[in-house]
Amino acid sequence: MFTAKLIKGKTYNVMGITFRAGVSQTVPKKLYEYLNENPYFILTQELNNQKDDPINYTESELKGMNKAEHESIISNLGRNPSDFKNADERIAYILKQIDNKGE
């Protein structure tokens, strides 16, 4: 699993993903390699025996997250976080996407 965290600036958009300052996001290997020499990011690679399966969140886990974490997940799912008015809409969208990927 590869993660990237923006450490300079407020937001940074690359390859359709919007990063917000101080929020770590899981990124594909291609983006990880692209950002490798970028001083605006801290990158980490976690080695484990799991496949690159998408992470599944429960409703209670999502309710425990803050707005920035919801927005990060929504960006990774390919949507614009500003399309959602409140936490309930963000959580409903994320859960729907998780259900759709499981089918």
From Swiss-Prot:
InterPro entries according to UniProt: Rho_N_sf, YqbF_dom_sf, YqbF_HeH, YqbF_N
Superkingdom to which the source organism belongs: Bacteria
Pfam families in UniProt: YqbF, YqbF_HeH
Record's protein name: Uncharacterized protein YqbF
